[in-house]
Curated annotation (Swiss-Prot):
Leader peptide range in chain numbering: none
GO molecular function, one term: transcription coregulator activity
GO biological process annotation, one example: regulation of transcription by RNA polymerase II
InterPro entries, sorted: Med14_N, Mediator_Med14
GO CC annotation, single: mediator complex
Protein name: Mediator of RNA polymerase II transcription subunit 14
UniProt keywords, alphabetically: Activator, Nucleus, Transcription, Transcription regulation
Family: Belongs to the Mediator complex subunit 14 family.
Record gene name: RGR1
Keyword Transcription regulation: yes
Positions with biased composition (Polar residues): 35-52
Superkingdom as given in the UniProt entry: Eukaryota
Location of the protein in the cell: Nucleus
Amino acid sequence: MAAVMMNGVGPDGAMKPNLDQKLNNHGGDTKAISSSEIVQQQTPARSLQSDNPLRMNDLPDEIVHITENFLSLNQLLSRLAQRSHNELEDTIRSLAKKPLPMPPMLNGNADHNTIEDLSNENLDKKVTLLKFAQEQHAKWVKALVITDWSKKASTLSKLIDLKVHMHTQMEKYDFVLDRMMHNKRNLAYARLPSPDLKTALEVLANGDAPWMPDLGYIPPPEMSPEDQLKWLEDLDTLLSLRLTIDDHDKIPYHFRNYRIGSGRVTFIVKGEFEVDLTIADDDPEKQYWFIDFRFLFRPAPPGLSENLRMYLELKVNEVLGAEGLAGCYKYLHELVLTHKINELRRQAMELSVGRWVDALNVERLNRSLAVQYWTSRYPAKAPNAPKSWIIIGVHSAAPSGGLRATAPTSRLALRWFRDNQEVKDIEIPLDEADLSMERILKDVIGRHTQQILTLMHTGLRNKPRFVNKEDHLVLELSRKQPSESLLTMQLTKLDSMVVRVDQIGGTFAVQPRTRPMPMAESNLNTPGRDPVAVIGWVRNTFAMEELVRRGKSQGWVVGKPPVKPDDLRNILSNREQTDAMAWFRKQGWRPQFYVLAHLSMSGDQWWLIELTTPNSNSAASTAGGIRIRTHVQLQFASKQAIMESPSFFSDLNYFTSAMISKMRDLRELHSRRINHIDQPCIRPGLSSNIRMPTIFIRTSEVLPSLSGKGSLGRWAADEVRLSVANVQSSSSTEVDRRGENRSALSTRMDSRIVIASEARLRVLDKSKFRQLSSRVDRDVAFNHKTGEFVLQLRSELGETMIDKLISRLQTIERLYEFLGSISRAPRGVQCETVTLRRVVFTYSDLPQPVSEELAALQPPTKRWKVVLDFADPRTVKLVLEKNNPHIRAVDMLQTLANSPRGLERLPFYLPTTLAVYRALDSISDAWLQLQVSRKGTFEIFTKNIDLATIRYDLPGPQARRLTLDVKLVSRRGELSWHVKRTDAEPNKSNDEFSRVLKEVWNTKSPNWKSLSTSACGPASAGVEELLKGIDKAVRTLLESPPLVLQQQQQRQPVVQPGQQPQVQNQANGVMNRGPQRPGLPGAGGLGAQMRQKQVPQAPMGNHVVDLT
């Protein structure tokens, strides 16, 4: 297999054959070697061992055999054949795609003549085929040339090796000659003349040598110090005259500041240099001469080196001679500018390898300096990452726009490119007197940092959160120290976020290093991210994490969203990608209530959400179709207080529980069609200044009596203010103590929320409640100053307060009715305890009109206690103490207390009827033993509280019955008890009751008044003496036999022995030996109560008393 050598130069400098030149030059000289001799690998001469005899070109080891870039002839021909085959296929496909020529047709038949086709399509195909053949022919001709040349490759390879070896040796020879000549030139400076030892010894010994030549120089006379001073003063005078008179118009503008002294003039250019010049002649046309030069900026060398001084003296003197002072200033000014640029470059290079390593890229231009800062701000792989750099160069100060500046001169100028854009509207000053590249970079970076933080501050300041001043946003800028520029944003009351820009790296640095901050810092340093959105995300995330942490520590549960995000579109219309949301639920709440916290830069929002509870069998439930039933936005008086109050979540529990209770109460009021107003009010006791829900209810629709049409009239204001006073947790043990079934509560949580609401009702006339104490009941208070009732209502969360409120209002109305009647009642009625659940008062007989002396001598009267229990809102329970005379009428009193205006009449009837019932008890107790011994019966029938019927049944042959009515009547404005006989036998001649009663009716007593057939006693103790007198008269009939029996005994025959006397049965007589009637007395002191027969009637009958 043959091999082909590629032309070129190897790594050791050897020449290589140029293959392309050979392939393109068909007629060139070619040499060939036999195909059996193949060169495969380059073997450098230094790598060959002397003991290796195998050399393909039979050359010594010192000659390097060139084999680099050799290619196998077989491989070359194979590739060429494959390429020719592929191009042939492509040509055939292209010819097939070309359209066929359309032959001419005659009468519909194609012409089949053998005439040559000269159509464009046919010619195009032929040209394509011809080009392909020519190209392939040329390639294969080249391959044939290479094949023929390869037959002579062995001889040519030796020639190439020899040529390269000879060329290398010639290069070495030329290098040695050049080095020798270089050393010879350098030795010229080290050459010393031959020493004159004879002359040296003579001079050292005698001080002079006679054979030394004498040049005949006359030394100038020595000058004394006074002459030297005078000479310098003269020189100063000449300089002053020349600069003032001759060269006044020739002095450059920047050389106006100069001083003269010590025989020289010093021109001072502030911030650049000062140069000392002098004159050598008093001719004003002669030039100035250079003496010294000093830099006037820092840092700069303290003095000039000898070489620089010599060069500068020659150059400045040359310029002074050619251009004068103007040329001198221009030359030195440009020299200083160049030196300043070099000094700034030196400082930049030191910074780039020092504290600012990997942050600066310093590049020296023609007469300028380019410094790129923040090179590591963006990742190296970031495409099209913006760059920032500065260019410090010399500004020509050429006038622009035809305006000529005053004394224009070149100066150092700085161009700033920020994020690939040149900043032209900002002039960055350079302190040319004190050069500091670090200070320049800090100034530029400070401005860049200011621009970044200002844009962020502007973007955040326009957010509603900061427009409404809910949080603090502070921007602090410093150009001298960019690291002190920072943007501070309040996250919570105690936490703030500080954003800085690293002055060296240009990356954002965020503090404090809490959990979301590293991610925020990474996002801020990512190209393409909006810093305002990132900072907003940090604030919302940090604040939400703080809320979740505090909420969990106070018994709040944070769960997954129970609804789909689409359901929140109607609630949260201003959602952003940086928002944060959390669903809170308090332990003890029902599962359909949640608090949704939505934090955003547009403002924080808190929503109370009530979800639907679909049936488990419904399709919506199986599909997870829980929807939002009610949503109420929680309004806070101060939104900033959300994060500031440590008791925020306890206040939130208070507020949301109140809202849930309010929602239930509003639905109840709506269902009952009671007018109301929902108006939130601020409760000062809450630290967050939360607007608590308050409901104002129209009282006249709850209590119809307040409409003014009732008998009581309007006694209270027509509104009740209902608000939540407290929220408490009720444990399961308290539920058990209440007697509730534990198994019925198995689905509830162990801790339940109890709402304590406060209802305020203001009375119109507070003097009518003066008998009340400030603490009416354990949950009712009355303010005597404002005349306001404060009711405490308790219920579980989610239950309505309206039923309890209506019940309490009705109780207050009954209490008002009773207290009004107490104020109008006789003086015998006194209140002892007045609460909303229980009223205790005492009563006694009506006071008699006696003098004060007699009243003081009378013993105190017995007072009887009455308890009115209002615990049951539907009824009033009346309780009398033991042995109270009114016990026999307790049922009627109970009915009276629960009747309309009954509580108003009760205090009137009790002292008015006390004497009557006490007399009846006394008479009943006196007849108790008589009834046991069958001597007669005494019965009381209480038809009404002011009407009683008493009946006497005496034994005898015929029934003897006396029936009397005791009725309260009013005559001439005075109350009295009228006692009269109501049976059918008062006019019989043999009526013994009329005989004994006549004595009573006709008796003149100061305690009652006789009315011939009846008597009338006052409501005080007089009626009691009247009834006892009647009873005493009736009991006289028990000692003598009846009048009828005496007459019968006179006509009755003597009874024979063995006969039984015939005794007439009396239906109601006590002498009947038959079974005892139910009305017989029982045991104990309450026998009178058990003996009475009460007829159920209405509590108030038709009587003559007018109580209005």
